[in-house]
Amino acid sequence: MWLRAFILATLSASAAWGHPSSPPVVDTVHGKVLGKFVSLEGFAQPVAIFLGIPFAKPPLGPLRFTPPQPAEPWSFVKNATSYPPMCTQDPKAGQLLSELFTNRKENIPLKLSEDCLYLNIYTPADLTKKNRLPVMVWIHGGGLMVGAASTYDGLALAAHENVVVVTIQYRLGIWGFFSTGDEHSRGNWGHLDQVAALRWVQDNIASFGGNPGSVTIFGESAGGESVSVLVLSPLAKNLFHRAISESGVALTSVLVKKGDVKPLAEQIAITAGCKTTTSAVMVHCLRQKTEEELLETTLKMKFLSLDLQGDPRESQPLLGTVIDGMLLLKTPEELQAERNFHTVPYMVGINKQEFGWLIPMQLMSYPLSEGQLDQKTAMSLLWKSYPLVCIAKELIPEATEKYLGGTDDTVKKKDLFLDLIADVMFGVPSVIVARNHRDAGAPTYMYEFQYRPSFSSDMKPKTVIGDHGDELFSVFGAPFLKEGASEEEIRLSKMVMKFWANFARNGNPNGEGLPHWPEYNQKEGYLQIGANTQAAQKLKDKEVAFWTNLFAKKAVEKPPQTEHIEL
């Protein structure tokens, strides 16, 4: 039983349902936009879709490595019915991620462009009336290096839950996060794009039937980390009212660059053929490079891959969020400790096997194809994983023993090794963020997603349940857009969409006919979401204690002025 989305031909629009017979046109602050109506089977009210609306001026030429500028107005009716290009990125990795994550029946091949600051809107509102529906703004994942708004079709979520869904793009990789650590290129350009998109939503969403006073930001992976950063950022004040981080928070250390960012900037400049005399020289030279030249530089840098040679402490798997004194005034750890953040209702969740298959096997090519691992190889591989987990060499034996020591089975050891990395990258940071948010007195909810979507790649082992990204199919209603979902999967997606939309409406996911989801308070109740959805307590409690303790040892051994890594 799959439900087909089909475009309502203007002429055959059924007057009985009051379907508009001409396509939707909406007036924005910058000019008029033309969209299209699409109906989802089973829903009388069509969804108006607007694709590729510019929310900022194209960040080209002298605007490269600068904060986004407001879009230029236009005087004609802008056609917003085709997908915008995705921000420039490694096309292979971008295409792969899109194919693995899309909830569409067919993945859309997207062009690349540095001119990419666009958003898509899905609104179920009757645009002839004054509606004020809750707004859900989606920030895609992809390690801040790849990804696109159009991978995610907001149609099913908008239709089922009567919410306005907005999917946004932001500069990625060198374009989005190049930082010299000083005023010449502060960095965080991609996050500033996210802020600009939220400003645009405040100014315009009412014309699309959305309520600017009820905006929920939600995102997965680097999108979840972005949401978490916006919760910590003074620049995002009053731009959103609730937040959801799926599988990624600002304490996910691989995405946040602490310490000196200059060496990475110099490495990029050298790879691009620029002199590194001063920051100003590097930035000036990189601004002269064509988009193609910077893409070539990106590919040469071999981001998003595990470097098995060389010193892992010097390996750079991605460019990330930096402490720029504007977006982030201090490190996420310091802001968390000071409780210096927006105390909006916050939902934070992880999947049961975050490092189960997609990240290690598809994105980073871990040498695990044999499907087993002995203790010695595990220790060496954990050291090579330093860029992801920041575990000091002297702590590796203890960490490996703790996770892998209980078994001699090398297949089990491999699974436990993947659990270890998942805990350090996602599980432990997510719980710490949720605890800090709760302790600041803000409503907090946690979940662990444990389900294997039928849409998973055939290459993924059947034993991997709750891999990174698996919840996306439920959140975006994939069973209503793709073929082949079971009744169980359809029910799960309906439930998840209802939880997410209730949270967007009320700051509380609970509602009639749904399993009870306890608030994350001192008892640390959370929801396990899957074939059997039920409340449980103390998610990753023991793991948080172990890692907090282990990282504290390292901090004590080394005086604070030397760089140490903390979760």
Curated annotation (Swiss-Prot):
Record's keyword annotation contains Ribonucleoprotein: no
UniProt xrefs under InterPro entries: AB_hydrolase_fold, CarbesteraseB, Carboxylesterase_B_AS, Carboxylesterase_B_CS, Type-B_Carboxylest/Lipase
UniProt xrefs under Pfam families: COesterase (PF00135)
Signal peptide: 1-17
Subunit-structure text: Homotrimer and homohexamer. Binds to beta-glucuronidase.
Family: Belongs to the type-B carboxylesterase/lipase family.
UniProt protein name: Liver carboxylesterase 1
Source species: Homo sapiens
Source organism phylogeny: Eukaryota, Metazoa, Chordata, Craniata, Vertebrata
